[in-house]
Amino acid sequence: NLLGRIKLTGGNEKELMKFYSILYRTLLFPRSLKEPGGVHYSPYSKHGDVYNGELSTDSGFWDAYRTVYPLMHLVYPDYAKKTLNGWVNAIKEAPDKMLAQWASPGKVDSMEGAMGEISIAEGILNNAIDDVDTAWNYLYTSTCTSAGREHFDLYAMLGYVPGQVSLSLNYYLSDFVVSKAAEYLGFETIATKLFERSKQWKLLFDRDTKFFLPKSEKGRFPQYTDKTK
């Protein structure tokens, strides 16, 4: 019983109902497409082929990377392993060998960023992924080429995505976590490159307003007449 793995002390009946209702909904997704016979239909493959093993779907990494997946590793490590191996199979079965940042059930990618990189890297660091080669090849391709990230060339050249502060901050965080996976696997050169790139968040911090702000391609912050608003 997944709900029973967390035992609460204190709290009234209403608070307990609220907690376990939220936990129940948290565990509904991502969802497995594996059928009782051990096979699955793949919405990621070009022709909807049938494969063996786990397959994961119905999850958006933009918010789940910092909520659902850490919870799985802490409380449900068996579930985390099954789910992450299902995502690695999704990478294998996709024609471009990339992870859908939002799957429903196939590739939708309606969320910005590449936060799935963080969940896959976390899986490597927690020894929750069986096919580490496929997982790492995805991480390398996604962080070091234009195949995985929108506006990658500008991001690599300028250190940020012009006009998009949220997207840039997402990339910095992904770079940092993937650098830790690279270090763990012994890829020191790539680890150093990504770690240094992750520190470029400083480029978007405006000391006048004390906010992160978007920059133009020429390196300028927007000019506000009233910086208190």
Residue ranges of each PLM-predicted region?
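Acidic/polar, glycine-enriched structural segments that form the non-catalytic walls/loops
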Residues: 1-56, 88-89, 96-97, 133, ...
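Extended glycan-interaction surfaces of carbohydrate-active proteins
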Residues: 22, 39-43, 47, 132-163, ...
